[in-house]
Amino acid sequence: MQSQPVAHLRLLFLATCLFLTDHASAQHMNAPDAPCRGPASNAETTACFISASKTADEQLNKIYVRIGEVLSADEQKDLQAAQRLWLRFRDTNCSAERNLYAGGSAAPMVYAACIEANTRQRTTDLKAMYGWRLQKFGKAIE
């Protein structure tokens, strides 16, 4: 059985994710800040988004580690639990979006674009949520 604070944290996190889903998921490839608007073919665009996803993941991991350095042990556990839930949400959400194109050549591209956009958004969210703490302890936000 989960403690009430952890259960409440999970519910709050999932509600937040559902609220942000519409913002983060619609037409990733056509978003003004999408990194792969130039390539013409599906294969080129998919490769671009896979590469961009790796870059977004590296940036997310960097800010996640930096945030962990300024948190107490309990706060680190909360962040870790939230991050695990977010990863499950992101992967499941992007799989559902990909499945809308099942059997089509766009499916891998849609999945890669979704992963990239959601990962980039998570980095932005973590910076917004923990930026004050990073500044307080003299850690650069980037």
Put a short name on every predicted segment.
Residues 16-19:
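Repetitive helical segments and hydrophobic/amphipathic motifs
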Residues 13-14, 24:
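Cleavable N-terminal signal peptides
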Residues 2-13:
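Bacterial N-terminal signal peptides that target proteins for export
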Residues 2, 24-142:
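N-terminal alpha-helical modules
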